[in-house]
Structure formats: structure tokens, C-alpha cells
A protein has these predicted regions:
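Short acidic/polar hinge/loop motifs at secondary-structure boundaries
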Residues: 75, 189-214
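Outer-membrane beta-barrel translocator/receptor signature
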Residues: 222-229, 237-287, 308-311
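Face-selective signature of the C-terminal outer-membrane beta-barrel domain
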Residues: 4, 312-336, 361-508, 533, ...
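Outer membrane beta-barrel strand-and-loop segments of large Gram-negative receptors
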Residues: 301, 419, 428-432, 466-470, ...
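Short, acidic, small-residue-rich periplasmic hinge/interaction motif at the N-terminus
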Residues: 21-26, 39, 51-55, 87-91, ...
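Surface-exposed extracellular loop regions of Gram-negative outer-membrane beta-barrel proteins
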Residues: 397, 502-505, 532, 536-582, ...
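Short, acidic Ser/Thr/Gly-rich low-complexity loop/linker segments typical of extracellular
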Residues: 57-71
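N-terminal periplasmic accessory domains that precede
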Residues: 108-113, 155-158, 174, 197-198, ...
């Protein structure tokens, strides 16, 4: 019953959007209108976002949704008899009959009181069984259902089920459309926590939506070549006490546990909410790298384990001063402890010059990230007219200690050892002012200001003779304006963002002269969007935006990130920003069995930032893995995704994408000479997530993914694929769900590469891809919906380095 109501509500919302566009196309043709106000029968409070559907002889005509004050106004109706349905999740549907005539053009239904449906569970949060995908003018929204929640315990695990998104299972580095230059936000806010770590701390059961914004408007921070991934967490605003509990365990080589708890209480003018997530487990990784560098041929076998424990908590309050003024505050607190231990075994093949090495290591790191957010929103008399002030402060303290010992592999004699004590402290302050004014019913103006101040201090201490410090400060001041216009079947939005960017970096070493870097850039970032809706079953969206990827602290920090006997990983302080011009065209078609969206995109990239490996100029026996700017490059591709209901018992989310890129740059060869190199690469990816409904409460999932080969200037990544099966069963009259999943049933998922620059090499990395997950989710509560809307914006820190390739 709940699922049917949810589908009705969702379809009603979609119909209302289309109907409103259709209405605006005929302003002068149909003079009739229907208005009214919807309230809760028990509390007499107005109900926002209620579906109002107008039918003629049981045939859909038009519709709309109520405002924050519960008011609806539907116009441009012919002189006819209609039935008006008032539909809302958890409430009984009410139908009113009206007749619009020349003598009675404007029908006022006055106040309509609706009551909760006694058949429904009292206040239990409704989670759709199946995830859905919505294509908006500037973003793709994935509404997370139980099928995705059961796909994994954390955000990182379910991201691989999302169209166009890939997560490296070894490093947890995230990419969008094959590019790792992507911003990751949580509730539209940034975090100083590295995205690869953040994805492992967010419980999947706490996620409401995932937004893919591949061509953000001028309102958004322009950083991120491939766009923005915004993770929207559940936040109830139901009257009374509501919440959910989620627990799970994953069995790989070792068990891993996760727990999540969400709680909300609203009474009167206050809404209190909070959630807590806990993850603990040991992860096993192993692999090899074979190098055929002349006179240094070697085989590295490595094995390392991570024992990670994380706590992530969010607590907040909304204070509704009155209908037009709302103050909100929340804080995020994240605690993470990671212990690493393992070894690298280096066997120099047919080489008597170099000694075979064994390097055991262990590391211990503790980090604490804290975010404080304040928001004040004023709503003016005119619907949609608002002013919003927001301040956000984030601080991340991340110390780490690592001990490396180099041994003669045969005799086990100690050659040398060293300790790395690294401390990183990052602070980020952001202040925004946003103004929205609907100038007319079809025209909207948005203006805004933003100030960002980011400071990072990174220190390395090995001994009194070898220590270094790196300070990185960024100040960014922005102003933006967008203007949107709708007419008939068309809608258009254009805008621009002006940014003043200033960066200062200082690198100090005990044994060398200080290194300084400064940059000051004034840039403008335009964006345009054009949408055409010829009918309720078809829509076209065309967009353009200019974006920038400024080097992150992980990409410019010259202090070594990690080390093996043959490779050091470090940043490049001489990196310059890369700029991208992005074009995109999408078409959405609604059919009897669901909706299908297809699109094409093109990106022109200037000074592309990418991974590079070269010989260490200070030690020819070692390589340096770092970053560099390559030449101007091009990438274009196609995407197809669909939400399809083949049968009443079988539905599927399907996505296919293919892209081609031309990469150019100057790369070191085996002779030590740097030469210009160019590569044309084509990659194909596919995903399908099937849901099979066996009974009312029992469902099965079958997920499969294929990630095609990818070529780069130095390395080619091999094909990757896997298949998962899972099931979920509703108990306790629908308030509880038991889920199970068997991941990578054929144990095929691993990372493998082949390289030929600067020398021939190949390797493979393995992790606990094959695993079994068992989980239980319980939802409770007593309230009804009354949501508060807060803006979602892009303000994320650029993703850092991490990972080998």
C-alpha cells in the first residue's frame, strides 16, 4: 500500500511539472482556475508538497503541488466538469467535483482537511523498494531505494551502482565519466576529509539522494572538470519522534561491522535531528608490479592490511521563527583511526648490482574533522522570493606516524630504517549570500556572493637533519548572477560567475632553501541551459559551462605521501589550474514501461592535470609518482540510462556509456629523454541492476557491471567486471527490512595495468572484492512530513592524490 502511494505521489509530481509547463504555454486560451488550501485534519497545520491532480472523466488533465503554506492554484482550465484529487503519502485521498463555466470561472475549494490513512504504518519512514533516476535541467537525481541500500554498507560501495560513477575499490578514488576531477559534497557542503575516506564513513542507509551535476550553473563553485557528486543525507522534518536503526556485517577474509542511527524530533517551532554512523574492520590488499627497466629489472610483491575505525555524527536544529523566517544550525563530527601494516618484497631479476629487499612497515593515524554550519533564510511575501545567509566552517586535524625498515631479503640484516611523522591541519571558512526573485511567473533572477578562505599546514619530521613544512593558503571571492525564463514549451537559463583566486604556498626544508609559490587569477565562468518539452513524454536539455580544476593540497604538496623501495609518491607545487569547456545534450523519453534518458557530451580541457611517473633526479634507483599538466585535450561520449518495469515482478535500472578521449603530453622515455606523446582511447562501461518481486515483502536483486579497458599516456588499465546477487525481506509489518548480498560471485574484480613509459611494466592489485553482507534496518516514528528546504551548492575541496595510478 505504501509503495503504491509513493508511486502515485512521484507520478503526480512528475505530471505536475509537465502540466505547469503546458499551462504556461496557453495563458491566454483557458480562463478557468481552481484554488484552495490543504491542512492536516488533526493538527490544522498546512501541508506542503501535496499532489493536486485534476481529471476529466478519469483522464489526467493537469495538476500541481501545494506551497510551503499548503496553498495550491491551478489555472488555464476549460469550461468543463472536473474531479480534483488531493493525494499525499500516508493520508487518505480526497476527491472534489467542480464545474467551471462562464458564470463561475474561478473555483475556490477553500480549506481541505485530510486525515492520516489508518491502514498505513504510523509515521514509519517510507523507503521505495526500487531506486529511481530523474533527469532535471542541470542534474541527474538518483533517489536511493532499498535495492541500492542493500548493495553495500557505505556510500563508496553503492556508488559503483550509479550510472557514470566509478569508485576504485583499492584506493576508493571516485570518478565521473572516467575522470577523477570531480567534487564530492555532502548535503551540498564541502569537507576537508579526503573524498576517498569520506565515502567509507557515510552509511548507505543514511543516503536519501545522489545528485550528478555534470554541467553546474554559475551559482555553483566552478571547480571540478567532470562535475559534482552531491550526497544528500536523510533529514526528517516529521512532527513527533521518528528514526531508523541500521546494522550490518560484511564477511570477507575478515568480518567488518557497520551501524547507523537516525533520529528526528519536531514539536512546534523546533526541529531537532541527528544521525550517527560507525564502521570497523580489517581490509586485506595484495598484488605485484613487474618492472623491465634496463639493468633494474625487478618484481615487487606487496601485501598490506588496514584496520580502520570511523565514527561520523551529525546533530542539527531548525528554528521556525515564523512562516517567513527560519534559522538552522548543524555540526558534523568525524573521528577516524587507521592502522596499516604490511611489507614490500623486491626481487631484482638477473641483477647482481642491487640487493634484494624486504621492507616491512606499519602506520598509525588519527583524524578528527569538524564542521559547523549556520543558515538564516528569509521568505518574502511573493512566492519563491527569498534571501539566504549561510556560514560554514570546517577543520580537519590528521596526524600520522609511519615506520619503514629496509632489510636484506636473504639475510634479514637491517640496511636502514626511518620514521615519518606527518601532521596535517586544514581549515576552511565559507560565507554565502544568495538572493532569489521570481520577477514574473515565468522569469526568475538569482544573485549571490561567496567568500572562501582555506588554509592547510603540513609538516614532516624524520630527524633533526631531515624535516619539512608546507603551508598552502587559498582565498577565493565570487559573485554570480543567473536569469531563467520559461515560455510555452521552452525554458532557458543563462548566468556567469566572476572569481578572484589567490594562492600562496611555502615549502621549507631543513637542508634546502625555502620554495615559494604565488598566483593571482581573475576569471569568469559562464553557463547556459536550454530545455524543450514538446509533450509530457519527451524532453530535451542542452547545456554549456566553463569549469576549472585548481590543484588540491594532495596534488601540490611536495612532502612525500607514501614510499616503497622503488617508488616515492609526492605532489608537484608547480601545477597550474586546468580549465574545461563542457557541452552536453540530453533527451528523456517516457514510455509505458518507464523512462529512458540518452545524452552526448563534449569536453575541451586546457592544461589537464594527471598522474605521471618519472625517474627521481636525486636517486636514479627510484621513481617518483606525482602530477603534471599535460597539453590541451578533448573528450566526448554518449550515455544511455533507463528506469524500466518490464513486468509487475521485474524492474531494472540500466546504464551504458562510452567515451573517447585524445590525450597529449610530454613523457619521459626509457632513455631518460622527454618526448611528446599522443594517445586516442575509447572506453565502454555498462551496468544493470535488476529487482525481482517474489512476494509483497520478498525481493531479489541481480547486479552486473562492466568497465572497459582505458588507455593513458603511460599506462593502460585492463577490463574490470563483476556480478552481485542480493535479497531483501520486509518484516514487522513493513517497519523492518532484512537484507543479504553476495558480492563478486565469480571473484573477477581486480585492477590490472600494462605500461610502456618510461619503461615496460605491468601489475595487478587485489582486495576483498568477494564478500557476503547481512544487514537489518528498522524504522519507527509517529509523525507526518513537513520538510524544510535548504540550498545545495558546490563548495568542495579538490580531491587529493592517493592511490598508485
Amino acid at each position: 500500500m505504501k509503495i503504491k502511494l509513493l508511486l502515485v505521489c512521484f507520478l503526480g509530481t512528475m505530471f505536475s511539472i509537465q502540466a505547469q509547463n503546458a499551462v504556461k504555454a496557453n495563458l491566454s486560451e483557458n480562463p478557468g482556475s481552481i484554488t484552495g488550501k490543504v491542512i492536516d485534519k488533526k493538527s490544522n497545520e498546512p501541508l506542503p508538497y501535496v499532489n493536486v491532480i485534476v481529471k476529466e472523466a478519469d483522464k489526467f488533465v493537469t495538476g500541481g503541488i501545494t506551497s510551503d503554506k499548503g496553498v495550491f492554484y491551478i489555472k488555464n482550465l476549460d469550461f468543463k466538469k472536473y474531479s480534483v484529487e488531493i493525494q499525499f503519502i500516508g493520508y487518505k485521498t480526497i476527491t472534489k467535483s467542480v464545474t467551471i463555466s462562464s458564470d463561475n470561472k474561478n473555483i475556490n475549494l477553500n480549506t481541505i482537511a485530510i486525515e492520516e490513512d489508518a491502514i498505513e504504518l504510523k509515521g514509519v519512514d517510507i523507503i521505495s523498494e526500487k531506486s529511481t533516476i530523474e533527469q532535471k535541467i542541470d542534474r541527474k537525481i538518483i533517489n536511493v531505494g532499498k535495492d541500492l541500500i542493500s548493495a553495500g554498507a557505505t556510500a563508496g560501495e553503492i556508488m559503483n551502482n550509479i550510472p557514470s560513477v566509478s569508485v576504485d575499490p583499492q584506493t576508493n578514488a571516485i570518478s565521473l565519466r572516467g575522470n577523477s576531477n570531480v567534487r564530492v559534497l555532502v548535503d551540498g557542503k564541502p569537507s576537508n576529509i579526503d573524498p576517498s575516506q569520506l565515502l567509507q564513513q557515510i552509511p548507505s542507509s543514511s543516503i536519501k539522494q545522489i545528485e550528478l551535476i555534470t554541467n553546474p550553473s554559475a551559482k555553483y563553485n566552478p571547480e571540478g572538470m567532470s562535475g559534482i557528486i552531491n550526497i544528500v543525507l536523510n533529514k526528517n522534518s516529521k512532527i513527533g519522534l521518528n528514526g531508523s536503526i541500521n546494522n550490518g556485517v560484511t564477511f570477507g577474509k575478515t568480518p567488518k561491522v557497520n551501524s547507523a542511527f537516525d533520529l528526528n524530533y519536531r514539536n512546534g517551532k523546533f526541529n531537532f535531528y541527528g544521525n550517527y554512523g560507525f564502521n570497523h574492520g580489517k581490509n586485506n590488499n595484495y598484488g605485484f608490479i613487474k618492472s623491465e627497466e634496463v639493468n633494474k629489472e625487478n618484481l615487487q610483491n606487496f601485501q598490506f592490511n588496514n584496520l580502520n575505525t570511523s565514527h561520523l555524527a551529525k546533530v542539527g536544529v531548525d528554528y521556525y521563527i515564523n512562516d517567513n523566517n527560519t534559522v538552522s544550525f548543524y555540526t558534523n563530527q568525524s573521528f577516524f583511526n587507521g592502522k596499516g601494516f604490511g611489507s614490500t618484497d623486491v626481487d631484482y631479476v638477473n641483477n647482481t648490482t642491487n640487493v634484494d629487499l624486504l621492507q616491512p612497515f606499519k602506520s598509525d593515524g588519527n583524524s578528527h574533522s569538524q564542521t559547523y554550519n549556520f543558515d538564516y533564510k528569509i521568505k518574502f511575501k511573493k512566492e519563491g522570493h527569498s534571501l539566504e545567509l549561510e556560514a560554514n566552517y570546517n577543520e580537519n586535524d590528521n596526524p600520522e606516524n609511519a615506520i619503514y625498515t629496509n632489510l636484506n631479503r636473504d639475510t634479514k640484516a637491517v640496511i636502514n630504517s626511518f620514521t615519518n611523522d606527518v601532521s596535517t591541519l586544514g581549515k576552511n571558512t565559507i560565507i554565502n549570500l544568495d538572493y532569489v526573485n521570481p520577477l514574473t511567473e515565468t522569469t526568475k533572477l538569482e544573485l549571490g556572493l561567496e567568500s572562501r578562505n582555506e588554509n592547510t599546514d603540513n609538516n614532516l619530521f624524520r630527524n633533526s637533519a631531515y624535516s619539512s613544512a608546507f603551508t598552502y593558503d587559498r582565498k577565493i571571492y565570487s559573485a554570480y548572477a543567473t536569469l531563467g525564463k520559461q515560455w510555452k514549451k521552452w525554458s532557458f537559463q543563462a548566468g556567469a560567475r566572476l572569481e578572484q583566486y589567490n594562492v600562496e604556498a611555502l615549502f621549507q626544508q631543513a637542508s634546502n632553501a625555502d620554495g615559494k609559490f604565488e598566483d593571482d587569477i581573475l576569471s569568469i565562468y559562464p553557463s547556459t541551459f536550454l530545455s524543450y518539452n514538446p509533450g509530457e513524454n519527451n524532453s530535451f536539455n542542452l547545456s554549456f559551462s566553463r569549469r576549472v580544476d585548481r590543484p588540491s593540497i594532495g596534488q601540490v604538496n611536495p612532502i612525500r605521501e607514501w614510499s616503497t623501495p622503488t617508488i616515492d609518491s609526492e605532489g608537484n607545487p608547480n601545477l597550474v589550474p586546468q580549465f574545461t569547456n563542457s557541452f552536453e545534450l540530453n533527451y528523456t523519453r517516457k514510455t509505458k514501461i518507464g523512462s529512458i534518458t540518452s545524452g552526448i557530451f563534449y569536453r575541451r580541457i586546457e592544461d589537464e592535470i594527471t598522474r605521471v611517473i618519472f625517474t627521481n633526479p636525486e636517486n636514479p634507483n627510484k621513481q617518483v609518482l606525482s602530477f603534471d599538466n599535460f597539453n590541451n585535450n578533448n573528450a566526448y561520449g554518449i550515455e544511455v540510462s533507463g528506469n524500466l518495469d518490464f513486468k509487475k515482478w521485474w524492474s531494472a535500472n540500466i546504464s551504458l556509456d562510452a567515451y573517447q578521449k585524445k590525450v597529449k603530453g610530454t613523457i619521459e622515455t626509457s632513455t631518460g629523454i622527454f618526448e611528446f606523446t599522443e594517445v586516442d582511447a575509447t572506453t565502454f562501461n555498462a551496468r544493470i541492476n535488476n529487482t525481482f518481486k517474489a512476494t509483497k515483502d520478498l525481493r531479489f536483486q541481480l547486479f552486473a557491471m562492466y568497465r572497459g579497458q582505458d588507455q593513458g599516456l603511460q599506462f593502460d588499465r585492463d577490463t574490470m567486471w563483476k556480478m552481485d546477487i542480493g535479497s531483501s525481506y520486509n518484516i514487522l509489518k513493513g517497519s523492518g527490512t532484512i537484507s543479504a548480498r553476495f558480492s563478486d560471485i565469480f571473484n573477477t574484480m581486480h585492477f590490472a595495468f600494462n605500461g610502456d613509459r618510461p619503461y615496460t611494466s605491468n601489475g595487478q592489485f587485489n582486495w576483498e572484492s568477494q564478500s557476503v553482507y547481512l544487514g537489518f534496518n528498522y524504522r519507527f516514528g509517529s509523525g507526518k512530513n513537513k520538510a524544510i528546504q535548504r540550498k545545495q551548492r558546490d563548495k568542495n575541496e579538490t580531491q587529493g592524490g592517493g592511490g598508485l595510478l
